[in-house]
Amino acid sequence: MDRRIAGAPFLAAILLASLALRASGQEDSTPEMPEIFNEPMPYFTIGLGPFSRTITTDSNEAQAFFNQGIQLMYSFTLMDAARSFREAQLRDSDCAMCYFGEAWAWGPYMNGPMGVGALPRAQAAIEKALELAPDHASRIERELIDAMAVRYMGRTDRTPQLAVDTAYAEAMGRVYEANEADLDVGYLFAESLMLLEPRRGNWDIARAEIQRIHHILEEILAKDIRHPGSCHLYIHSTESTTQPNKAEACADFLGGSIPGASHINHMPSHTYNEVGRWGDGVRANQRAWHSDQAAEYGEGFAIYTSHNLHMLLFAASNDGQGAVAIQAGADYTTATGGAQYYEVLTRVRFGRFEDILAMEGDDTENPIFKAFWDFGQGYAHLRAGHVDVARGFLEAIQEGRGSAPEAAEFRGHSASDLLGIVGGILDGEILREVGRTAEAIESFERALVIEDGLRYDEPEPLNFSVRDWLGAILLEVDRPVQAEAVYRAAIEDHPFNGWSLFGLEQALRAQGKVGEAEETAKILETSWARADVWIRASRF
């Protein structure tokens, strides 16, 4: 990948020196590295933020590459971080912390375990750091190196990871106790504790372990709310709790802290989506998507591109920004080289049924993606008056649900659950269309039970909720009290989403609750300010 370099003279010379330094070799027995490590790692003068950590080195270039490496670590861009730390080693072969950084980069992190072949690389790096530390590291640096050694030394690929993670957290805890004012030490300790928790699922904010993590991160952010790594972790540690709003203040700073890191650009939306700041969620992920594209020109760091687009279309769907959501769905298809399911699902959300019918199908054999396609086609045909055709697509979904392999899943959600939801919505709408409203309500309610049973995910696999269908039909059969309850639950799940606010206003007016309805209308006006769609119900 061609990456451009510009900036101060000593940094402009970095890339030119890389090949010569590499040719001279490093005096260690580094295990075989991924092929990308044969290429020089550039120093990015476009995309990095101001964050730095001074280390023991006489080389400005080594310091610069170390700073780049730690910013990439805070951005979860681990492979490029490891490459940056190795470039720092080439500039100063006595830099103990440059080897520490590489060892850190090969380890497990919030979004994944150690990669294949990573352990011997990490061991080689930390061995070198230990060798250099007595003469080329400060006291704090030696303590960090010793703690990182606990993570890797004396173990094999068969050593239980939990035992390793526990020992590492205990070692890092001792470093933290002696250096609580050091923000990066605090980050490393908090990260080590978070690795002991399940990555997915809801976190109980009352648990002592979670409170400890929050306390450490809050202490760091009280000193410097712009610390990118700690805010990143704080968002992850609060998003699935009952108080995701605790991270709003730092989220407002995080997105621009490492301007070219798409994951950092995107991360505030994990908080914004939970608190209903959908417009901000859209902007965060648009910025991330731009960084992903800029990375092709050496001006950004791309990671999790499909996730950024998924979050973008999800936030835009809840914000009423149909054009943005649909385009993000199309970009998702291109970015993944996969099926067109989000192109279909965004069009269902925004009532673009003629567009769905004009789409050419793909040949996906994935039972979930095929069902999403069938759902969109069936729904569009139903709205076009083709009830029998819609029934045919519903039957395909139901057959697919029965025959899908038990292991079939999307983002950790089973085929049975996801097909049960979209099949339930389509079934309910078909029943409603033919006047069997009581059965339609039952179908929506069954689908809602499945939806409520899905594990925590950010974002959810579907960019809409069954509640918007259930609430709409309850209003149609003159059951506004029940509809109000449905919409209030929908707003609790997805605060300030315009679809459910619209339904709630209707339900309140139907009960004669004029004052509450007017207040809801004001909230809707603000929440729906960026919407490009006019709606008459909470679903098309």
For every predicted segment, state its role:
Residues 78-80, 102-138, 149-163, 196-206, ...:
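Inter-helical turn/loop elements of alpha-helical hairpins
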Residues 66, 100-101, 187, 232-233, ...:
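Alpha-solenoid helical repeat scaffolds
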Residues 103, 107, 117-134, 282-291, ...:
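TPR/TPR-like (Sel1-like) alpha-helical repeat modules
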Residues 60-67, 94-106, 136-157, 181-201, ...:
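Amphipathic alpha-helical repeat scaffolds of TPR domains
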Residues 72, 106, 150, 193, ...:
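Residue at a conserved register position within TPR or TPR-like alpha-solenoid repeats
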Residues 90-91, 176-178, 221-223, 253-260, ...:
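Solenoid-like repeat scaffolds
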